[in-house]
Amino acid sequence: MRFSFTHPMSAGDHDPRLVGREGLTRLALAAEAAGFDAIGFTDHPMPGSRWLAAGGHDALDPFSALAFCAAATSRLRLMTNIAVLPYRNPFILAKAAATV
């Protein structure tokens, strides 16, 4: 059985520490140290009012965030919980995913 950890972008009040360089590094390293197998980010390029009201202010670009976490860790697998395809050019999305 494998366990993954999802970036807590909508788990409560907005916390800017979770989206900065230091916060992402600490989060990824903590997930790896705790034994998680993967870290995930959800794609919400255009959040609606319901999403924002639930605290979804920290929706990072998943591929940029995953690349950052990959550079900070040594064994975590990377995943997107959602990649909203209609918002993205399919060729650029494929290249970003392949690069990460």
Spans of features found by a protein language model:
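Conserved catalytic cysteine-centered active-site region
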Residues: 73-81
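Short flexible/disordered coil segments
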Residues: 69, 99-100
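Glycine-rich anion/phosphate-binding loops
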Residues: 18-26, 86-99
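Glycine-rich "substrate-gating" loop/helix at the edge of Rossmann-like oxidoreductase active sites
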Residues: 53-57, 83-88
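N-terminal beta1-alpha1-beta2 module of alpha/beta enzyme domains
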Residues: 1-72
